[in-house]
A protein has these predicted regions:
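Short basic helix-loop element that most often maps to the first helix and adjoining turn
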Residues: 1-15
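Recognition helix of helix-turn-helix/homeodomain-like DNA-binding domains
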Residues: 17-34
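Polyampholytic, low-complexity intrinsically disordered segments
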Residues: 29, 49-84
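DNA major-groove recognition helix of helix-turn-helix/homeodomain DNA-binding modules
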Residues: 36-52
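C-terminal interaction segment
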Residues: 54-62, 106, 110-111, 119-120, ...
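Nuclease catalytic cores
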Residues: 61, 84-87, 92-105
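Short, surface-exposed charged micro-motifs
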Residues: 79, 191-193
């Protein structure tokens, strides 16, 4: 996001109030677990609700008042998400994007099959009626639902326990700001943002006092809702990226 907006470290420090040395260490990856108040200051600085709204499609005259009934009447080939009554266009995922989501889902599914339990993994495209209302229907890249009553014929009714978004240039602002806010408000327990371009994973475990925790692809990333018994290995993903996968 720093690169995308064209800010220097000095500008970020001056405008956010975070010391220059701290800013440099966070964005270089030297500091893996920044203090919570530091993260809040940086998140506030980068928060762009108006720019996020620019990704709302202008094709829909009633944006802001659409419902899941309107969503259900759209053609299958028209990929959108409905968030608070607004339609957000979704580009078709790349081969790399789907490979990453598929690898994360595979490891989760294998763990659940081997260890049992009531939780069910899913992978996009699955509709999630996040707020149990008529104004929001999203399609997270990967998720886990542990309350079987939330699993419906159409998809998931209510907040999943665990969600992953693999970001792309077209979804970056939405995943970092709008969806983060929606997921925490809806009661999602854990949310991962996988930035494969930077080879980073931001882990938001909302039951913890400190988040996000930032991981690289060089070591397994623990899934907190499983008390760290499940860890996602990014070795294959890192290799694919090295081989030129996009």
């Amino acid at each position: 996001m720093k690169k995308e907006k064209g800010y220097t470290y000095a500008q970020i420090a001056n405008l956010s109030g975070v010391p220059l040395g701290t800013v440099q260490k966070i964005f270089s990856g030297e500091t893996v677990n920044p203090r919570y108040d530091t993260l809040l200051a940086l998140e506030h600085f980068f928060e762009e609700p108006l720019e996020v709204r620019e990704h709302v499609s202008n094709r829909y005259e009633r944006n802001g008042s659409y419902t899941v009934d309107d969503y259900s009447t759209l053609p299958d080939e028209q990929r959108v998400e409905l968030i608070d009554g607004y339609f957000y266009d979704m580009a078709s995922p790349t081969f790399g994007h789907q490979s990453i989501g598929g690898e994360i889902h595979r490891q989760i599914a294998n763990f659940i099959v081997e260890n049992g339990g009531n939780c069910r993994p899913f992978i996009a495209p699955v509709d999630v009626q996040l707020d149990c209302d008529e104004k929001t229907m999203v399609q997270p890249d990967v998720g886990i639902v542990c309350d079987s009553s939330k699993i419906q014929r159409f998809g998931v009714y209510g907040a999943p326990d665990f969600l992953v978004e693999v970001i792309s240039p077209s979804t970056k602002k939405k995943d970092y700001t709008l969806k983060l806010s929606k997921y925490i408000e809806a009661g999602v327990r854990e949310y991962w943002i996988v930035d494969y371009m930077q080879e980073k994973v931001l882990v938001y475990f909302f039951e913890s006092d400190v988040y996000p925790v930032i991981y690289g692809f060089d070591k397994p990333v623990p899934v907190n809702i499983y008390d760290d018994n499940l860890k996602i290995d990014f070795t294959n993903i890192a290799k694919w990226l090295k081989d030129g996968m996009e």
